[in-house]
């Protein structure tokens, strides 16, 4: 029953795409149709989700045979388990709010209908990825979110930065896709199937190679350390794109892939250790990078990358349900933070530099209140949405001594989260206004207010509802020292205090020269400088030298002109060194003749 209802809610999403074939696509009401369709799909999806939670079933798989290729049977297969049943309503709710926000933010764009079509396709491909039960179907969704992110990041294609950012996103994801395809090939070769339940049932040995491929895929898609530079660059797209990309679609796809494969990962300690280290490095590195950024959207982008690192850490300590809880809770406040920043940017005539803001608390009370609550939820203040997942992750990491290194990095990153959140509030909302006095600020638009209001309610209450319905629903009694329970809160408060102390110090003490730590953070750990400059420079110089050696030096000089000139020179030297003494020549003839006659007579 509820599998049919869930599939109906997913099919409803395709209606606007079908209608866009006809003239309604040209109609100005098309964006409103898309927004309403998503809201209906969300309400419809709530019914099967509630039924699923209360029925206590584990998984429902709907199978339609598609094709058979020799021994491989491909089917259109939907897997409706806890992960997909909870994620679909969350993604639909967040996207509904983002669509409504887009009606206000993109109202003057001449191609708004195409923009909404792209956003809807983006959502549909994510739904395909989440509900897929075989690797081929999952790959379709995986590539779908990749190409849609490329189109949406480069929406304002007249700007060079937007084009570069879109190319960067697609190229970094290509590196990840190599890992995915390698894993697909390995599973096909060793298990002769792409269906997830069959792979888990066969439980192949020596899964290091495919899981390494899947980890590489997740690193590319979820912007983990090494393949992370595309995420802050993606801020060149419109704010609704940033909100959708960073909350419930693209970036969580990599984490979701690892969650799907947790039955294989939990038995492989090598991959788990690697995942734990990768997540810990990412969460700390990106938190450090966020500290000195001045673009409001880039700070929030780096915070996304930091939270994704936290999710990867959670998978590394073998807690997939906890990582999934953090995906769901993170979607609400992260989308709201982007929408609040979009509201500020739009009101200040596209100004993104937080140093040119200030005093917005009086001018935009609703937006600033939402921004503060979103920042508090991000830092994990008790009883807001972020607390229910973030606090649990740190508590769970505390249960084993082997996690000590990763736990320390996670705690430092959690503290730094409070620092950069305070920095946004301090620079953008408090103090004296630093923008032009003639700027007209107006946030009284129902599309803007309603969309942020819904996510604000979600940022306060969603964590409580989702965490109460996460497995296991009957929680075993746990004993934990009070100091351990309060660790996460303590480091957050420490971060707030540190940020305020530093802000007060900087007013009194001005550094003459920026320190190396500041430079490291501001230049993003020198990573883009090294990786985006040195390899192209090395390739360019190497290709230039090889081209000049092969074409100019060898072919044009050494083989034809130089070889001929060398031959002529040696010949002329040989000829010119002859003395012209005819007696010697005759004598040499005579010696030769005498020797030949002697040899002839000797033979006889």
Swiss-Prot record:
It is an enzyme of class 7 (translocase). GO terms for biological process: electron transport coupled proton transport; mitochondrial electron transport, NADH to ubiquinone; mitochondrial respiratory chain complex I assembly. InterPro entries: NADH_DH_su5_C (IPR010934), NADHpl_OxRdtase_5_subgr (IPR018393), ND/Mrp_TM (IPR001750), NU5C-like (IPR003945), Proton_antipo_N (IPR001516). It comes from Equus caballus (Horse). GO terms for molecular function: NADH dehydrogenase (ubiquinone) activity. The gene is MT-ND5. Pfam families: NADH5_C (PF06455), Proton_antipo_M (PF00361), Proton_antipo_N (PF00662). This is NADH-ubiquinone oxidoreductase chain 5. Keywords: Electron transport, Membrane, Mitochondrion, Mitochondrion inner membrane, NAD, Respiratory chain, Translocase, Transmembrane, Transmembrane helix, Transport, Ubiquinone. GO terms for cellular component: mitochondrial inner membrane; respiratory chain complex I. It is a multi-pass membrane protein. The chain crosses the membrane at residues 2-22, 41-61, 85-105, 115-135, 138-158, 169-189, 209-231, 239-259, 271-291, 299-318, 323-345, 364-384, 411-431, 455-475, 486-506, 582-602. Core subunit of respiratory chain NADH dehydrogenase (Complex I) which is composed of 45 different subunits. Its EC number is 7.1.1.2. Core subunit of the mitochondrial membrane respiratory chain NADH dehydrogenase (Complex I) which catalyzes electron transfer from NADH through the respiratory chain, using ubiquinone as an electron acceptor. Essential for the catalytic activity and assembly of complex I. It catalyses: a ubiquinone + NADH + 5 H(+)(in) = a ubiquinol + NAD(+) + 4 H(+)(out). Belongs to the complex I subunit 5 family. It is found in: Mitochondrion inner membrane.
